[in-house]
UniProtKB/Swiss-Prot annotation:
The active site is at D274 (nucleophile). This is Putative ribosomal large subunit pseudouridine synthase SVR1, chloroplastic. Its main location: plastid. Residues 107-117 have a biased composition (Basic residues). GO terms for cellular component: amyloplast; chloroplast. It comes from Arabidopsis thaliana (Mouse-ear cress). Highly expressed in young seedlings. Expressed in roots, rosette leaves, cauline leaves, stems and flowers. GO terms for biological process: maturation of LSU-rRNA from tetracistronic rRNA transcript (SSU-rRNA, LSU-rRNA, 4.5S-rRNA, 5S-rRNA); maturation of SSU-rRNA from tetracistronic rRNA transcript (SSU-rRNA, LSU-rRNA, 4.5S-rRNA, 5S-rRNA); plastid translation; pseudouridine synthesis. One of its GO terms (molecular function) is pseudouridine synthase activity. Residues 118-135 have a biased composition (Low complexity).
Length: 410
């Protein structure tokens, strides 16, 4: 009987659905109670109700109360053939571009998120520490002009002309260094070099001049103003006469204490003053500076104070201003002036300014006028004047502003 009832109920449910003929629709209505009737040929009809229990509640979403309908974002994507289609995931190329933008444009936000995360193990902290220098190395620091100049002067060494390296090392002036190269007295890495234009690096190349090796690190450039006394020459050829460079012996002897590990500069005078002339002479180890200052094209005015024997008349001043022949060239002074008399100086004095600076030029001008020179002193070169408190045989290091007054632009 139970089997008959079950089969009858099933057939009844099927016939019930067929009778109702529910249309296919996306909307379904819940049925709470169903009235059923079962009958057979041997018994009377039996009616009963079928109740449906309500569905169990679905578990809450793990996205903080957000329903799946809210999480679904439709994407309309155009395919390769040009048709539009609807998909639930964003295109792959969009995800790739967003990842690149987040990495390149927002590095600070990325770093903040990393800082919030606690370090789990020592290995992770080591990884973070090791990766931080790489991120800093990608950004090049901006250096000021002063910092770049300091680096170029003290650390950066680029190949230079061989003649310029010799002049910077204090071997000789640029022109004299070129003559040494042409004469075959310079070797580079054991090979004789006859071209001054050869590019060398003193820190890497082995350079010899007359059997003496040029140090790898060039000495710093120094500049001095010397008040040369009488009896000193500006060259080193005559051993029986003292050289003006010997006045720097004390300075050079204490060089190693003041500059440990730095080679001593080889000093030489810029231009010359004869043995009987006193006053301003520039001493340096910079060959470029010496060539610029002593070259005739610089046309730097040089002022001399000369004391003469006897009285000076107008005709003497006229004769000096007209000039005279010196070394085959007619030299004319820039100015000639009779200085006022002083009680402590009985002799007459002249202020003479020249710009050519030829050998014995001022003495020849005074001699040509019929006067005898008693003493001669140079007091000015260009815009730099010999300090009044600088005693004979003493020297003072020149400042950058004083070098500019001498016409030097480094």
């Amino acid at each position: 009987m139970a089997s008959v009832a079950a089969s009858s109920s099933i057939s009844f449910a099927a016939s019930f659905l067929k009778i109702k003929a529910f249309p296919l629709s996306p909307r379904f209505f819940p049925i709470r109670t169903l009235r059923c009737s079962v009958s057979s040929s041997s018994s009377e009809p039996i009616e009963f109700d079928i109740s449906f229990a309500p569905p169990k509640p679905k578990p809450s979403s793990t996205h903080g109360g957000v329903t799946p309908q809210q999480l679904f974002i439709p994407w309309i994507v155009r395919s390769d053939d040009g048709t539009l289609k609807l998909q639930s995931q964003p295109p792959a190329r969009l995800i790739h571009n967003l990842a690149i933008d987040a990495t390149t444009q927002n590095p600070k936000k990325k770093d903040k998120s990393k800082k919030k995360q606690p370090q789990a193990t020592s290995s992770s902290s080591a990884t973070t520490t090791a990766s931080s220098p790489a991120s800093h190395s990608e950004v090049k620091p901006k250096l000021s002009k002063a910092a770049r100049r300091f680096y170029n002067e003290n650390f950066k060494e680029q190949p230079q002309r061989l003649s310029k390296v010799l002049a910077a090392a204090g071997v000789a002036s640029r022109r004299t260094s070129e003559e040494l190269i042409f004469d075959g007295k310079v070797t580079v890495n054991g090979i004789l070099c006859n071209t001054p234009q050869t590019r060398v690096d003193p820190s890497r190349d082995i350079i010899y001049v007359n059997g003496n090796r040029i140090p790898k690190k060039l000495p710093p450039k120094v500049y001095f103003a010397l008040n040369k006394p009488k009896g000193y020459i500006c060259s080193s050829g005559e051993k029986e006469i003292k050289s003006a460079i010997s006045l720097f012996d004390e300075y050079l002897s204490s060089w190693d204490k003041r500059n440990p590990g730095t080679p001593k500069p080889r000093l030489f005078t810029v231009g010359r003053l004869d043995v009987a002339t006193t006053g301003l002479i520039v001493v340096t180890n910079d060959g470029d500076f010496a060539q610029k200052l002593s070259h005739p094209s610089s046309s730097l005015p040089k002022e001399y104070i000369t004391t003469v024997v006897g009285d000076i008349h107008k005709r003497h001043l006229m004769a000096i201003s007209e000039g005279t022949m010196v070394e085959g060239v007619h030299c004319v002074p820039d100015s000639v002036e009779l200085m006022p008399k002083q009680h402590d100086i009985p002799r007459a004095r002249l202020r003479i300014v020249v710009h050519e600076g030829r050998n014995h030029e001022v003495r020849e001008l005074v001699k040509n006028a019929g006067l005898e020179v008693h003493s001669l002193k140079r007091v000015r070169i260009g815009g730099f004047r010999l300090p009044s408190d600088l005693g004979l045989g003493k020297h003072v290091e020149l400042k950058q502003s004083e070098l500019k007054a001498l016409g030097w632009k480094n």
